[in-house]
Amino acid sequence: LASRVAWREPMSGIARWLDGQVRKLGVDLRLNTQATEASVLAEKPDEVIIATGGVPNRGRFAESDLVHTSWDILEGRIMPAEGQSVLVYDDSGDHQGVSCAEYVATRGASVEVATPDKHVAFRLGPTNRPIHVRNLHKAGAVMTPDVRMSGVSREGNRVVVVLKNDYTGAEEERVVDYVVVEHGTLPREDLY
């Protein structure tokens, strides 16, 4: 997912390199395979390394069918069409939210990135943040700091998002085609 934004494509080489190194050692890799306790024990392994990964955290909107995650966009399950509006609510301040926003903005969607932080991509350092922000500006994205997403509802075939300012308590509504939330990742704990 990290390599979906064009300037971060070289990141995909890390996974390829790691895969090659492990295979050189003769490790039997089982990727993209549903593992259960029974299926693992049936193999009678000498050693087991479980890298369960995680799932996107939807935060307080976990039960809502009105919000998507940055994973939905970056994995290609959802792709707003050119001209459609997207609000990306980035509560993590890391690469995922701004990468998602940049990805859809550079493909012609109208994008707003809202965050409770004092600026977009708050947790990124001085090397990566300026690149994301520059690319978002070039694509015409709007960046709105100091707000929390406090509500989401359907209005016809669009979605109404309520953003609440952390300092004043003032609320504003946005009516968009897609809402994407980035709240980080939850560990997959079903195997242990």
Listing of model-derived features with the role each one plays in the protein:
Residues 1, 60-63, 100-102, 191-192:
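Short amphipathic alpha-helical segments
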Residues 4, 93, 184-185:
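Short beta->alpha junction loops/turns
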Residues 12-57, 66, 71-75, 82, ...:
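A Rossmann-like FAD-binding core segment of flavoenzymes
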Residues 76-77, 95:
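Hydrophobic transmembrane alpha-helical segments of multi-pass transport and channel proteins
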Residues 82-111:
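Rossmann-like NAD(P)H-binding beta-loop-alpha module
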